[in-house]
A protein has these predicted regions:
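Short linear motifs at protein or domain termini
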Residues: 1-102, 211-229
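Short helix-capping and inter-helix turn/linker motifs at the boundaries of alpha-helical repeat units
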Residues: 11, 108-111, 175-178
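Solvent-exposed, non-membrane alpha-helical residues enriched in polar/charged side chains
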Residues: 17, 21, 25-26, 41, ...
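Hydrophobic recognition helices of helix-based DNA-binding modules
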Residues: 20, 96, 100, 143-147, ...
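C-terminal regulatory/effector modules of DNA-binding transcriptional regulators
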Residues: 43, 174-229
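Alpha-helix C-terminal capping/termination sites
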Residues: 102, 125, 192-193
Length: 229
C-alpha cells in the first residue's frame, strides 16, 4: 500500500478525499489496484466511515470503480477512453491557458511558475524523475489558476483524476524526450507575452503529444500498460 499521511483533524472525510485525490493525481496507484477501506483507514489513522465517504464520492465521480465489499478499484484506461479524455482536456486546458494569457499577473505568480519550470528542466537533465510529475502537475495547475475561473480549474482536475493512474507511464522514456522541444517553456513565454493563441496552442500540443505516446502503450485489448523496463 502506498504510504499516505495520517489524518489528525476534522473534517475527516474531506481530508481523506483530498489525500486520495492527490495520490491519484500523482499516479501513485497503478491501474487495477484494489483499495480496501480497512487498509486506507489504517494508513490515515481513522475509522472506516470517513474513508467510505471519500471513496463513495470518487466512485460517483467515475474516478474509482466499485470493487468487492468494502473496496474500490483503480480503473484501467483504454486507448479509446484516453482519446475521449484528450479531446476534453485539450478543450478545457487550452481555454484555461488562453484566459491566463489574457489576464495581467503579478511578478510573484510568474516567478513561481518560472521556478517550477526550472526545477522540471533540472530534474529531466539529471534524470531524477521521482518528483517530476508532482512539479509538472503544479506547473499546469498554476497556469490554469491564472485563468481566474475556479469552475474551469475544478473540471480540469476531474479529468486529470481519470487519467492520473497512467500519467506515471511517461516516466522515464517520454519525459526525457522533452529536452527536444519544451511546450511548457513555450506556453509560459506566450502567457507572459499575452499571446492567447500561442498559450493555447502549446498546452494543447503538450497534451496531445503525451496522449499519442500513451496510446502507443496499449496492448492487444486496447488497455494502456506500463512499458517494460
Amino acid at each position: 500500500m502506498t504510504a499516505l499521511k495520517r489524518i489528525e483533524r476534522e473534517p475527516l472525510w474531506d481530508l481523506a478525499h483530498a489525500q486520495l485525490r492527490d495520490a491519484l493525481l500523482a499516479g501513485r496507484f497503478e491501474p487495477g489496484t484494489v483499495l480496501t477501506l480497512r487498509s486506507l483507514a489504517d494508513s490515515f489513522g481513522t475509522s472506516i466511515t470517513p474513508v467510505r465517504d471519500a471513496v463513495t464520492r470518487l466512485v460517483a465521480q467515475g474516478v474509482l470503480q466499485q470493487g468487492p465489499r468494502n473496496s474500490a478499484i483503480v480503473p484501467h484506461l483504454s486507448r479509446r477512453e484516453l482519446s475521449d479524455l484528450t479531446v476534453v482536456r485539450c478543450a478545457l486546458e487550452g481555454r484555461a491557458s488562453r484566459e491566463a494569457a489574457l489576464r495581467r499577473h503579478d511578478d510573484a505568480t510568474l516567478r513561481k511558475l518560472k521556478e517550477r519550470l526550472s526545477t522540471m528542466q533540472s530534474l529531466i537533465s539529471a534524470r531524477k524523475l521521482e518528483s517530476y510529475l508532482e512539479h509538472h502537475r503544479k506547473f499546469h495547475f498554476g497556469i490554469y489558476a491564472m485563468s481566474g475561473i475556479p469552475l474551469l480549474v475544478e473540471t480540469i482536475e476531474n479529468m486529470w483524476l481519470r487519467c492520473g493512474p497512467v500519467l506515471s507511464f511517461v516516466i522515464p522514456e517520454y519525459v526525457v524526450l522533452l529536452k527536444g522541444w519544451d511546450h511548457h517553456t513555450a506556453a509560459l513565454k506566450a502567457i507572459m507575452a499575452g499571446d492567447a493563441d500561442g498559450a493555447e496552442r502549446e498546452i494543447v500540443a503538450d497534451i496531445s503529444d503525451a496522449a499519442h505516446y500513451l496510446a502507443s502503450l496499449a496492448d492487444s485489448t486496447g488497455q494502456l500498460r506500463r512499458p517494460s523496463s
